[in-house]
């Protein structure tokens, strides 16, 4: 049998190239669709507090304020993003991958504030039972929560009187929510560390217990061993990066929580800069900065605690690092929104993981009279490559 060489005609060759280009184009578009991350970020929901004034009413409970915010979140996916040169500008949001809340679920139980048990039940009602958020594929959005200083103090005690003296309900609730296969009925801060990670569309999310102190960094080091240096990493914690001395373990005496020293023992690391709260946190922050220098793929730090919207850069005590920081408002204790309810805000974070562009948009969720209407506020674009 004689073999013949096959030489495709010009028409056949052109058609084949067209099919190949169409396939490559469709594949690229499919990958592009998968490269988008959308998540909502809020913090300091403080169940147990009341708001002096909200939507024409006085002394409005956190349950009602937070429920109003949740209603706006639930309808956000149908909204069109503004023409602001950000990721997905002028396009419908379409889906929310996750709702992230960085702590202070329950307010500290001082001066007649309700118990953490009551606050956790209200949290479940608002952010679990009334949560209708879903991803672009129709599946339910993840709810990702870490504790704040109020949650931890309710569980371990405080240097001022509380009633009751301890109630770990929100710490137990957060732990069981995030570790459903290892549920607990009591809480021990030395055993039940609330830290975990998630991989979402090519980004590694790390969720921390209050602050990345030396103990958290040991766990983070192990977690990051499985992550490529080219994978962007986001950190989520309650505390500001320039952490306050009171968060650390009391360096004095038997290292307990007491009225004289007023350290809160919120993280395991013992305070080193001084013996009282008048000191700095230079040593503690430098430990974190060194960790950042060892892991340059840590790109963004999300936090609450100080309760206003700000997108800024953390430089460290020696001005030798540059970490993008996203600070968010509190629906109950906002430094700005407390006086002007139209400034109440949460953040919508959108990233294209192929281009490496991250867009953060402030959602002014109470700026209009409609119960589910909002205005866009601050906006920032970051290139993470």
Roles of regions detected by a PLM:
Residues 37-39, 47-53, 215-219, 334-338, ...:
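Short, solvent-exposed loop/turn elements at domain surfaces
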Residues 44, 103-104, 148-149, 238, ...:
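Active-site glycine-centered loops adjacent to acidic/histidine catalytic or metal-binding residues
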Residues 36-52, 202-211, 236, 323-330, ...:
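Active-site-proximal beta-strand elements of phosphoester/diester hydrolases
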Residues 14-25:
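Bacterial N-terminal signal peptides
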Residues 2-16:
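Bacterial N-terminal signal peptides that target proteins for export
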Residues 28-115:
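N-terminal active-site segment of His-dependent metallophosphoesterases
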Residues 109-221, 225-232, 258-270, 311-333, ...:
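Extended active-site neighborhood of metal-dependent phosphoesterases/phosphodiesterases
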Residues 32, 71-95, 135-139, 185-192, ...:
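His/acidic metal-ligating clusters that form di-metal
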């Amino acid at each position: 049998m004689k073999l013949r060489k096959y030489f495709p005609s010009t028409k056949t060759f052109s058609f084949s190239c067209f099919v190949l280009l169409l396939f490559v184009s469709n594949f690229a578009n499919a990958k592009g669709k998968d490269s988008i991350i959308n998540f909502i970020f809020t913090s300091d929901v403080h169940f147990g507090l009341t708001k002096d004034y909200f939507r024409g009413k006085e002394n409005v409970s956190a349950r009602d304020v937070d429920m109003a915010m949740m209603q706006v979140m639930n309808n956000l996916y149908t909204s069109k993003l503004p023409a602001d040169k950000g990721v997905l500008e002028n396009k419908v949001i379409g889906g929310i991958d996750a709702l992230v809340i960085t702590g202070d679920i329950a307010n500290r139980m001082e001066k007649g504030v309700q118990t953490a048990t009551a606050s956790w039940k209200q949290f479940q009602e608002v952010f679990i039972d009334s949560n209708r958020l879903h991803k672009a594929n129709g599946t339910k959005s993840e709810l990702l929560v870490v504790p704040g200083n109020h949650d931890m103090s309710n569980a371990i005690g405080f240097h001022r009187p509380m009633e009751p003296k301890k109630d770990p309900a929100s710490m137990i609730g957060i732990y069981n929510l995030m570790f459903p296969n290892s549920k607990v009925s009591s809480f021990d801060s030395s055993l039940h560390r609330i830290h975990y990670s998630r991989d979402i569309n090519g980004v590694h999310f790390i969720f921390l217990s209050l602050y990345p102190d030396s103990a958290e960094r040991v766990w983070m080091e192990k977690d990051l061993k499985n992550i490529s240096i080219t994978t962007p990493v986001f950190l989520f914690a309650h505390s500001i990066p320039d952490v306050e001395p009171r968060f650390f373990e009391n360096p004095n005496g038997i290292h307990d929580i007491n009225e004289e020293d007023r350290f809160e023992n919120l993280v395991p690391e013992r305070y080193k800069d001084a013996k009282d709260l008048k000191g700095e946190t230079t040593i503690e922050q430098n430990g974190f900065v060194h960790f950042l220098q060892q892991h340059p793929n840590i790109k963004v730090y999300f936090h609450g605690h100080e309760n206003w919207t700000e997108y800024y850069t953390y430089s460290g005590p020696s001005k030798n690092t540059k970490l993008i920081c996203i600070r968010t408002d509190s629906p109950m204790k906002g430094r700005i929104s407390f006086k002007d309810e139209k400034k109440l805000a949460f953040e919508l974070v959108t990233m294209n993981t192929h281009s490496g562009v991250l867009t953060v948009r402030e959602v002014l969720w109470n700026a209009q009279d409609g119960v589910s209407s909002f205005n866009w506020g601050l906006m920032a674009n970051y290139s993470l490559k």
